[in-house]
Amino acid sequence: MTGFRDQLGVHAQALVLRETRNNLLTSNIANAATPHYKARDIDFGAELARASGNGTVRTTEARHFAAGGPAARGEALYRDPVSPSLDGNTVEMAVEQMEFAENTLRYQTSLALLNRRISGLMTAIKGE
């Protein structure tokens, strides 16, 4: 018999990681005018693979972080800017806003899938 956590699948882990990423992205946006602030992010794919116990991650783009590096240990990575500012700040507002919007949408999707999974489990428990 599998546990309740197993029944939720990867969605519960994804929500936690999306929240962590959301906090990093909002911190980046809040510090957009702070001199020498370095934009941070996590490698979501590597973190999710680590959290789910699957150590292999497929990268489809050259800009993806390699698995097994700092992100695999749960550390935030520094993002390399396309055009760094003169004051050493690496936050690019357009990039941060786009990443924030995408992360929020994916968070909501994971939440909806998790809610659907829980509703299905409740239906099975009630015997309806």
Swiss-Prot record:
Function comment: Structural component of flagellum, the bacterial motility apparatus. Part of the rod structure of flagellar basal body.
InterPro entries assigned to the protein according to its UniProt record, in alphabetical order: Flagellar_basal_body_rod_CS, FlgB
Family membership: Belongs to the flagella basal body rod proteins family.
GO biological process: bacterial-type flagellum-dependent swarming motility
Gene name in the database record: flgB
Name the record gives this protein: Flagellar basal body rod protein FlgB
Any one of the GO CC terms: bacterial-type flagellum basal body, rod
Quaternary assembly: The basal body constitutes a major portion of the flagellar organelle and consists of a number of rings mounted on a central rod. In Gram-negative bacteria, at least four rings, L, P, S and M are present, whereas Gram-positive bacteria lack the L and P rings. The rod consists of about 26 subunits of FlgG in the distal portion, and FlgB, FlgC and FlgF build up the proximal portion of the rod with about 6 subunits each.
Keywords, in A-Z order: Bacterial flagellum
UniProt cross-references to PROSITE patterns, sorted A to Z: FLAGELLA_BB_ROD
Subcellular location, record wording: Bacterial flagellum basal body
Signal peptide limits: none
PANTHER family attached to this UniProt entry: FLAGELLAR BASAL BODY ROD PROTEIN FLGB, FLAGELLAR PROTEIN
